[in-house]
Amino acid sequence: EYARAFRTVYNAIKSMNANARVYISLDQQWNRNRSSKEAYDARDLLDEFNSILRAEGNIDWGVAYHPYSVPLTWPKFWSLQTDFYRSLVLDSPDTSMVTMTNIHVVTDYLQRSQFLTSSGQVRSVILSELGYTSSYGEDVQAAAIAYAYLIAANNQHIDAMVLSRQTDAVSEIAEGLALGI
């Protein structure tokens, strides 16, 4: 149903602005083998979504990815705290989670022939939501943002990076997330 609803929205947007880009939004849970109404794996959803859209006529959709750190409360995504967290973030298409450390997993996956656009191009990828807590200091938060930007800028298939918040959200501070810059 989602793919069909997406196509309807896509067609409505394109009818008003032929140059608009329309994205499917996915979070950092790439391949955790979840199957419930409350959670899904981004890779499984992407596979099914693409399969349905191709079968019914390929359109030019893109991916809006949210590569938050694991756990969300740890800003140093390049240096995960425990073996457990490190086991979730691998340089493999079978990784459980995708953060900025391994964001290339998504862009590499989209280079597969079945995901290419009708013109043979890799689909647009934007990092439409990410952020790092300042709970460990603003210098650590700034380093995380700068490093994330460096990774994004050096991946030719990432078209944009958007930070989650300009100011801290009161509801998130209690959870250890001070994502405002």
Predicted regions, residues:
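Noncatalytic carbohydrate-binding groove/subsite architecture in carbohydrate-active enzymes
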Residues: 2-139
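Aromatic-rich peripheral "rim/lid" segments of glycoside hydrolase catalytic domains that contact
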Residues: 137-181
